[in-house]
Amino acid sequence: MMPVLTLITRLGVGVLCLGLFGACASYSIGGSNPHVAQAITHAQEAGDHGGMGHADALVTHAEVALQHAQAAKKDMQNPHLDAGIAELGEAITHGKAGHTDVATDHAKAALMHLQEIK
């Protein structure tokens, strides 16, 4: 009876460990910082609106993305976050100047950098 109980205990511990590992892995893959997730969402919106020629909407979403990216920077250091912040700043500057195509390129570059944050 004892070997069966030991086997069941070991299986239970193994399943528990796998479950914890899976939870941790999905947490890091999904992005551990909610501000990064919001920055990605708004950078995507900025790029989408820029592609439609909507400079004002691009600027609005890029500004929100920038606020979230700067908030994330308080919690983490990442070169992609720094690059994303710089690109969002450029997107805002060019969008306000009416350079929608250039602003869109910067918003898309920001999005690519933000998506690289693990």
Regions found by a protein language model. Name each.
Residues 5-6, 22-118:
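Long, charged/polar, soluble alpha-helical segments
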Residues 10-23:
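Bacterial N-terminal signal peptides
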Residues 2-11:
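Bacterial Sec-dependent N-terminal signal peptides
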